[in-house]
Amino acid sequence: MDLINSTDYLINASTLVRNSTQFLAPASKMIIALSLYISSIIGTITNGLYLWVLRFKMKQTVNTLLFFHLILSYFISTMILPFMATSQLQDNHWNFGTALCKVFNGTLSLGMFTSVFFLSAIGLDRYLLTLHPVWSQQHRTPRWASSIVLGVWISAAALSIPYLIFRETHHDRKGKVTCQNNYAVSTNWESKEMQASRQWIHVACFISRFLLGFLLPFFIIIFCYERVASKVKERSLFKSSKPFKVMMTAIISFFVCWMPYHIHQGLLLTTNQSLLLELTLILTVLTTSFNTIFSPTLYLFVGENFKKVFKKSILALFESTFSEDSSVERTQT
C-alpha cells in the first residue's frame, strides 16, 4: 500500500498550494484514519498468521516462497499504517521526526513495488510451469525462486530511493509540521525559481511509478494468465478449477485495488482541488487497505465451497492453494 503523495504540496506559478487532504471534511478524515487503523490491526494479525504457516508449516517450494514474500510486502505496509492514520487525525501534522518521515515514505513505496512485482513474478512462474514444463523441471527450483525474490527486493528498493530522498518535514509559519515530498530538494520551499524543477520531477516520478508500478506489471499478469488459461482449457492441465480462479482473483484484485491510487496520483499533478480529488483519495485508502488485508484471504477461499471452508484448517486451505500442481509438472509440451 502506498499513499506517499497524499499530503504533498502542489506547485503552481505563484504559490504553494496544499493538496486535497487540507480540504477534506472532518468526517472524511475520520473515515480515512479509521480505515487505516483497522487495516493495520487486521492486516498485521492475518498476514502474520499466513507468514507463519507458509514459513514453518508447509514444504518450501517455489509457490510458497513467492507467496511468502508477496504477503511479507503486505505485512510491512500494514505495520506503518498507524503513523499515517495518526497524522490524518491531527490534520496532517507530523510529530515523528524527519528520519521517520523518510523511512515511512520509503517503506510505503517499497511495499507497493514489491507487491506488484511479486504478483508479476507469480504470473511468470505459472506461465513457465504451464507452457514450458520441461524447462521448469530442470530449472524451476527453490534456489531459482530465491534469486527471483532477491532481484525483486533489490529492484523495489532501488525504485524507492527517490521517495526516500525527496521526503522531508516542512514547518509552516503556524508551527505545523508536515511530512511531504520536496521534489527540488531545496530548503526554500516557496522559491519561484524551483517551482518548474519541482513540477518536472513530480511528473517524472508519477510517470515512472505508473509505468513500472502498474501498467507494465498489469500487462505481464494479463499476458501470462491469458496464456495459462488457454493452455489449461486446451489440455485440462489442472485437477481442479481453483488455480485458474486464483489467477482471475489476482488480476481483478490488482486492477481494482491499484487503479484508484494511480488516478489519484495523476490528479495530484493539477492544482484543481475538486471533489473528485477528495473522493479518489478516500477510494484509494479503502481499496489499498482492502488489498493488504483481504487479498491473501481471497487466494485461500476462492474456489472453495463456502460451507466447507469452516471444516478445513488453515493449513489445509494453504496446501490446497499454494501447493505445487503435480499434474502440470508432469505434462510435457
UniProtKB/Swiss-Prot annotation:
Tissue and organ expression note: Expressed in spleen, lung, heart, liver, kidney, pancreas, thymus, gonads and leukocytes.
Primary localization: membrane
Membrane topology note: Multi-pass membrane protein
GO molecular function per UniProt: complement receptor activity; G protein-coupled receptor activity
Extracellular side: 1-30, 87-103, 166-209, 269-283
Superkingdom classification of source: Eukaryota
SUPFAM superfamilies the record matches: Family A G protein-coupled receptor-like
Keyword Glycoprotein listed: yes
PROSITE patterns noted in UniProt: G_PROTEIN_RECEP_F1_2 (PS50262)
Glycosylation, residue list: N5, N12, N19, N272
Keywords for this protein: Cell membrane, Disulfide bond, G-protein coupled receptor, Glycoprotein, Membrane, Receptor, Transducer, Transmembrane, Transmembrane helix
A GO CC annotation given for this chain: plasma membrane
Pfam families: 7tm_1
Recorded family membership: Belongs to the G-protein coupled receptor 1 family.
Name of this protein: Probable G-protein coupled receptor 33
Protein source organism: Homo sapiens (Human)
Gene that encodes it: GPR33
